[in-house]
């Protein structure tokens, strides 16, 4: 059962659509190598605001992904962003899965 998640928000520099898409494609590959992350989504909110969400069955699983996933990758690609991304830890109250 999924009980915790992480919600990340990225404010990106204008005109870097291709680079940002590649950043999230690489993020998906990282997540696929982390079995604890059972659900992962990358999305665009508007032209310069993007996000990612992942859900986990335990706090330990979430911590494992955060130690190798988004925070690490975003530091390596800081030139894409107008400032540091935010990573919010969330508790899942209800989950509907197929």
State the predicted function of each range.
Residues 1-5, 9, 38-51, 74-98:
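Glycine-rich beta-strand-turn "strand-cap" elements at beta-sheet edges
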Residues 16-18, 60-62, 95:
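Residue-level signal for secondary-structure boundary sites
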Residues 13-15, 45, 57-59:
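Short coil/turn motifs at secondary-structure junctions
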Residues 26-39, 55-89:
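An amphipathic, aromatic/His-enriched active-site/gating alpha helix that lines ligand/cofactor pockets
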Residues 11-22:
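Short, surface-exposed ligand-recognition loops at beta-strand->loop->(often short) alpha-helix junctions
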């Amino acid at each position: 059962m999924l009980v915790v998640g992480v919600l990340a928000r990225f404010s990106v520099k204008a005109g870097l659509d291709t680079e940002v898409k590649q950043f999230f494609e690489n993020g998906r590959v990282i997540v696929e190598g982390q079995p604890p992350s059972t659900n992962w989504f990358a999305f665009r909110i508007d032209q310069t605001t993007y996000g990612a969400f992942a859900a986990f069955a335990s706090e330990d699983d979430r911590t494992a992904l955060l130690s190798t996933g988004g925070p690490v990758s975003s530091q390596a690609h800081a030139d894409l962003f107008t400032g540091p991304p935010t990573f919010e830890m969330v508790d899942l109250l209800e989950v509907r899965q197929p």
